[in-house]
From Swiss-Prot:
It comes from the Eukaryota. F-type ATPases have 2 components, CF(1) - the catalytic core - and CF(0) - the membrane proton channel. CF(1) has five subunits: alpha(3), beta(3), gamma(1), delta(1), epsilon(1). CF(0) has three main subunits: a, b and c. Keywords: ATP synthesis, CF(1), Chloroplast, Hydrogen ion transport, Ion transport, Membrane, Plastid, Thylakoid, Transport. It is a peripheral membrane protein. GO terms for molecular function: ATP binding; proton-transporting ATP synthase activity, rotational mechanism. The keyword Lipid biosynthesis does not apply. Pfam families: ATP-synt_DE, ATP-synt_DE_N. Belongs to the ATPase epsilon chain family. This is ATP synthase epsilon chain, chloroplastic. It comes from Nymphaea alba.
Length: 134
């Protein structure tokens, strides 16, 4: 038995295919979803989506949004997403270093909040590359 997973951004469809299982970062922690999961709607945090095909795990960096799960259908609507395999490791590492430097230089609440969000996005991209296969 499988799940139909659809990952959408405002500009494009990132993924639309059958999967065996996913692990999703929500605002209240990670959840695993297998076939016949109870219906839920949840907010998605900036983080990693792990996707299990037959015997292979793939990763995707998600930049926050919402998910709806029910009847073996998973629809994920996010601000932005990138497949781990599409992320350039050197560019992601540089972006992480810049985000860390910007956070240390941030002054005022607004700059600190924006720098923290940029750092979380950069960490999610690096984690998507470095995620260990299960």
């Amino acid at each position: 038995m499988t799940l139909n997973l659809c990952v959408l951004t405002p500009n494009r469809i990132i993924w639309d295919s059958e999967v065996k299982e996913i692990i999703l970062s929500t605002n209240s922690g990670q959840i695993g979803v297998l076939p016949n999961h109870a219906p839920i709607a949840t907010a998605i945090d900036i983080g990693i989506l792990r996707i299990r095909l037959d015997d292979q795990w793939l990763t995707m960096a998600l930049m926050g949004g919402f998910a709806r799960i029910g009847n073996n259908e998973i629809t994920i609507l996010v601000n932005d997403a990138e497949k781990g395999s599409d992320i350039d490791p050197q560019e992601a590492q540089r972006t992480l270093e810049i985000a860390e430097a910007n956070l240390s230089k941030a002054e005022g609440k607004r700059q600190v909040i924006e720098a923290n969000l940029a750092l979380r996005r950069a960490r999610a991209r690096v984690e998507a590359i470095n995620a260990i296969s299960y």
